[in-house]
Regions:
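Short, aromatic- and glycine-rich surface loops/edge beta-strands on solvent-exposed regions
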Residues: 92-101
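Extracellular Ig-like/FN3 beta-sandwich strand-entry sites
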Residues: 52, 89-93
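Aromatic sugar-binding surface patches on proteins
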Residues: 74-83
Length: 128
């Protein structure tokens, strides 16, 4: 009689957007960043697979996809992150979707970029 292996299910335990990752932990976590931030990090903790797979961090500014970063997941508990350079005129609403290899959105994180005066600048984020 063979052993039946239960199918692994990926679960995003934690998703953070911040200004750095130091010693494999996020730094500068917030939901609002100044347009002068430069680079942001999306940090995720993923559980549920003992097998090697990938997830993607898909960065959106409004409805414009700004980046799609594929990341390896190689253990039951895995920490990984991606980075995105933020241009100063990219103010407004943002989100990062964590997407499985089969295209399922596992979790999303929303945040906002504001101008250095604390005001939002009107930017058309519906088209390229």
């Amino acid at each position: 009689m063979g052993v039946i292996k239960a199918q692994s299910v990926l679960k995003v335990e934690r998703i953070v957007v911040g200004t750095a990752v130091e010693e494999r932990l996020p730094v500068g976590e917030s939901d609002t960043f100044a347009d002068s931030v430069g680079t942001l990090f999306c940090y995720t903790e993923i559980r549920g697979t003992g097998d090697s797979t990938t997830v993607s961090h898909v960065w959106y500014h409004g409805e414009i996809r700004r980046a799609d970063v594929k990341l390896n997941v190689r253990g039951y508990r895995w920490r990984t992150w991606s980075t995105k350079v933020i241009q100063e005129d990219w103010t407004g609403e943002w989100r990062v979707d964590i997407v499985s290899v089969d295209g399922k959105i596992l979790k999303s994180k929303r945040f906002r970029i504001i101008d250095t005066d604390g005001n939002e600048v009107a930017v058309d984020t519906t088209s390229n």
